[in-house]
């Protein structure tokens, strides 16, 4: 059963281990269509030069650091690379008829709660994850959703990370997304590149039918219901049970942003 933030106690946070459910920000990662760039500023070059400029000293005077300066990294990346949280602003300028929240405006209470894993590994690439699939997955674990629970969709696609097959994913529909939201769920995560079906399938369907309403249908459900989604999770198969654990998925505060990177961790 999900608890409200006020009900969390030291006892309720008792856990035996933590499981990292995140991918990292990797330099020129092959699984990122817009790959990050990481410029590393070294102890003995750029860091040292900065020390000399900032403090007006020479290397020989840095006896306490062995003549070295600090290391820095200069990262160029979109907010939707690596494991990240999409804010309602990502889906459009409004949500539920109100101005959509950017990532730093989303309530902290959404991002730490009881977790539920739904096993959807039987869904083939390109298939839709329907309401019936979610209902069957919940019935299989004898669980009734509670408000603020963080629902994690296990497709198994993370095992293909770094290969072309990673982008061959099933995806949520408008109806299945709204169904979870109508149960009080505010955060839904998936261990795939994206939340919707693979791009090629959506594009081909629109080309053949002339109907583009199914493109990014799960994303655009956020225009009707306010929710966040986590993309590019990993290691959901390492969770020892489908319920009875807690998830932390606080996003980085990026001013006015449509998303933010997150180190998603399960406490089991």
List PLM regions with ranges.
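Active-/binding-site microenvironments in catalytic and ligand-binding cores
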Residues: 1-268
């Amino acid at each position: 059963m999900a608890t409200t933030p006020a009900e969390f106690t030291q006892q309720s946070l008792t856990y035996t281990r933590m499981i990292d459910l995140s991918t990292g920000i990797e330099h020129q990662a092959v699984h990122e269509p817009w790959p990050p760039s990481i410029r590393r500023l070294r102890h003995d070059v750029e860091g040292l030069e900065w020390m000399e400029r900032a403090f007006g000293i020479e290397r020989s005077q840095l006896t306490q650091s062995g003549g070295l300066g600090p290391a820095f990294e200069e990262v160029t990346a979109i907010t939707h690379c690596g494991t990240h949280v999409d804010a309602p602003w990502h889906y459009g300028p409004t949500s539920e008829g109100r101005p959509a929240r950017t990532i730093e405006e989303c309530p902290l209470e959404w991002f730490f709660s009881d977790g539920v894993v739904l096993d959807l590994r039987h869904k083939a690439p390109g298939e839709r994850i329907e309401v019936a699939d979610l209902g069957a997955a919940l019935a299989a674990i004898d669980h009734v959703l509670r408000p603020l629970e963080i629902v994690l969709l296990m497709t198994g696609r993370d095992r293909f990370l770094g290969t072309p097959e990673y982008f061959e994913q099933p995806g949520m529909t408008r109806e299945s997304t709204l169904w979870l939201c109508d149960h009080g769920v505010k955060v839904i995560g998936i261990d795939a590149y994206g939340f919707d079906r693979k791009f090629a399938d959506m594009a081909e369907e629109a080309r053949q039918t002339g109907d583009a309403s199914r493109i990014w249908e799960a994303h655009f459900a956020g225009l009707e219901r306010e929710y966040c989604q986590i993309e590019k999770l990993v290691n959901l198969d390492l969770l020892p049970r489908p319920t009875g654990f807690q998830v932390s998925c606080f996003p980085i505060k990026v001013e006015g942003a449509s998303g933010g990177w997150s180190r998603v961790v399960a406490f089991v």
